[in-house]
Curated annotation (Swiss-Prot):
The keyword Cell inner membrane applies. Keywords: ATP-binding, Cell inner membrane, Cell membrane, Ion transport, Membrane, Nucleotide-binding, Potassium, Potassium transport, Transmembrane, Transmembrane helix, Transport. This is Potassium-transporting ATPase KdpC subunit. It comes from Escherichia coli O81 (strain ED1a). PANTHER family: POTASSIUM-TRANSPORTING ATPASE C CHAIN (PTHR30042), POTASSIUM-TRANSPORTING ATPASE KDPC SUBUNIT (PTHR30042:SF2). Belongs to the KdpC family. The gene is kdpC. GO terms for cellular component: plasma membrane. The system is composed of three essential subunits: KdpA, KdpB and KdpC. It is found in: Cell inner membrane. Part of the high-affinity ATP-driven potassium transport (or Kdp) system, which catalyzes the hydrolysis of ATP coupled with the electrogenic transport of potassium into the cytoplasm. This subunit acts as a catalytic chaperone that increases the ATP-binding affinity of the ATP-hydrolyzing subunit KdpB by the formation of a transient KdpB/KdpC/ATP ternary complex. It is a single-pass membrane protein.
Length: 190
């Protein structure tokens, strides 16, 4: 019975620290130092949330740049169902999915002169990726330009404006945030 009191007091002390003080401290510091990131990197237009800079959206019209396929096929870009397709490279089902995606992209982008960029036909590990390379965005320019009556030069400049360079040049590659790029396209129409 003599060991019960120190064990109970240690338990209560650690419960207070790990269940109360630590979460409150990290939340307060996150809100203070990184308020935009701590709140989900939400993209707002006035009082309306248009999306998150961290999660892709299902842009399907010809007037929008398309991102990577979502692995959450039933409800595209659903963060609650996040996860990869888990299909191995040797799996025939993956080959069928990629072939179907290539055919759909070729049909939607008949003026594209090069091969379909790989990230437009393969899902990311999370299935929610919001970034593609500037080259994959540029591949879609003819379709978007035709649908929106914009010039190739305008869209090339827009892609360059929304391209983000890697933090360290030799690690990673430039990317374009599809959500931000498509919202900028919508603003051009206003």
């Amino acid at each position: 019975m003599s060991g019960l009191r120190p064990a109970l007091s240690t338990f209560l002390f650690l419960l207070l620290i790990t269940g109360g003080v630590y979460p409150l401290l990290t939340t307060a510091l996150g809100q203070w130092w990184f308020p935009w990131q701590a709140n989900g990197s939400l993209i707002r237009e006035g009082d309306t949330v248009r999306g998150s800079a961290l999660i892709g959206q299902n842009f399907t019209g010809n007037g929008y740049f398309h991102g990577r396929p979502s692995a959450t096929a039933e409800m595209p870009y659903n963060p609650q169902a996040s996860g990869g397709s888990n299909l191995a490279v040797s799996n025939p089902e993956l080959d069928k999915q990629i072939a179907a995606r290539v055919a759909a992209l070729r049909a939607a982008n008949p003026n594209a002169s090069t091969n379909v960029p790989v990230e437009l036909v393969t899902a990311s590990a999370s299935g929610l990726d919001n970034n593609i390379t500037p080259q994959a965005a540029a591949w879609q320019i003819p379709r978007v330009a035709k649908a929106r009556n914009l010039s190739v030069e305008q869209l090339t400049q827009l892609i360059a404006k929304y391209s983000q360079q890697p933090l360290v040049k030799y690690i990673g590659q430039p990317v374009v945030n599809i959500v931000e790029l498509n919202l900028a396209l919508d603003k051009l129409d206003e």
